[in-house]
């Protein structure tokens, strides 16, 4: 048979079809992958208790993992323990060898840590330590120190207002009762305030020491009730974070009351605005980028088999502890120079006039 160019082309086409068919057959015989494998996961708790997790932690962690050449996911539980557990399961199923965990609740943290360790993964507690767990490392701020800063900031504000010497009535809006950090903050501020209550220099408001679950809506309801129980005569508030401080401010305004010494935490844009406007005395500024970078570096070192450098221990856990700062009108620009916040985040609308 004569082998013409036309016949050659037909033969090549036929061979190509057979090759594609065989390739497809082999490919379909292979087990499907459940998803791309990853080396690490960062699990954040929610968006309700603070805006920091979406504004700062998530992007900083993603950038740090990328810079370290680590494949990782950063996930938020959106205030659900069951969702956070499912996220952890998904990460482990994809091969994650390190879980960087900021637990929504201590119970969730214990369950996630136990599961991760049983599957050969290391757990780094991020911002919140899970007590009595098999965590490998802890990266956070000195949280007892945070509480002390808040208490001393409240006292300084009372003195500046001239009410410290008149046995002012103080209310405390604590964070989450199931959150170990909430207890550490309280340990810190109670170490300063309790002796003053005992000596009579300060007076704790009636029903004036309550837990809020870090929920500003719940905090508002509780503070409304505190005002009612104390005939609107509360002269200072230790609010555990900026969200709760905002709830206090909303309540004061609703009752046509003037600003009183009031603390916060997290240096949120709204918190800084309230400081500039005179409604909030100060906030604890925790530079999140160094914290995120430090935590990501621990994960990177573990994955690459390098030694992890720590600077302390908390409850026996090797830890990296960073130093918080008390932020007021006097030093609020620090958040701009550190690029923690943009001036355009704070100095806008009715608050623009307060920025110098």
Regions found by a protein language model. Give the residues of each.
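A residue-level marker of the well-folded mature domains of exported/periplasmic proteins
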Residues: 2-6, 10, 27-356
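Bacterial N-terminal signal peptides
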Residues: 12-21
């Amino acid at each position: 048979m004569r082998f013409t160019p036309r016949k050659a082309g037909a033969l090549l086409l036929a061979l190509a079809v057979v090759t594609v068919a065989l390739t497809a057959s082999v490919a379909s015989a292979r087990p499907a992958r459940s998803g791309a494998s990853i080396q690490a996961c960062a699990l954040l708790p929610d968006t309700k208790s603070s805006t920091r997790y979406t504004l700062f932690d998530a992007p900083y962690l993603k950038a740090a993992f990328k810079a370290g050449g680590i494949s990782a996911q950063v996930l938020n539980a959106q205030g659900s323990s069951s969702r956070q557990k499912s996220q952890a399961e998904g990460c482990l199923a994809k091969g994650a060898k390190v879980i960087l965990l900021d637990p929504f609740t201590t119970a969730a943290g214990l369950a996630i840590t136990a599961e991760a360790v049983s599957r050969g993964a290391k757990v780094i507690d991020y911002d919140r330590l899970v007590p009595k767990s098999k965590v490998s490392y802890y990266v956070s701020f000195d949280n007892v120190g945070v509480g002390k800063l808040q208490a001393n900031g409240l006292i300084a504000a009372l003195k500046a207002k001239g009410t410290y010497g008149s046995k002012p009535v103080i209310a405390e809006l604590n964070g989450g009762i199931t959150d170990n950090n909430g207890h550490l903050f309280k340990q810190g501020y109670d170490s300063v305030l309790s002796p003053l209550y005992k000596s009579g220099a300060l007076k704790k408001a009636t029903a004036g020491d309550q837990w809020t679950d870090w929920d500003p809506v719940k905090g508002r309801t509780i503070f409304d009730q505190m005002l009612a129980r104390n005939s609107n005569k509360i002269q200072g508030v230790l609010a555990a974070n900026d969200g709760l401080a905002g709830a206090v401010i909303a309540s004061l305004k609703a009752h046509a009351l003037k600003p009183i010494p009031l603390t916060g935490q997290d240096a949120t844009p709204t918190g800084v605005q309230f400081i500039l406007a005179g409604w909030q005395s100060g906030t604890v500024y925790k530079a999140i980028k160094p914290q995120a970078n430090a935590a990501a570096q621990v994960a990177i070192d573990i994955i690459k088999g390098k030694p992890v450098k720590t600077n302390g221990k908390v409850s026996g856990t090797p830890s990296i502890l960073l130093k918080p700062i008390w932020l007021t009108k006097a030093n609020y620009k620090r958040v701009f120079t550190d690029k923690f916040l943009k001036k355009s985040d704070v100095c806008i609308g009715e608050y623009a006039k307060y920025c110098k």
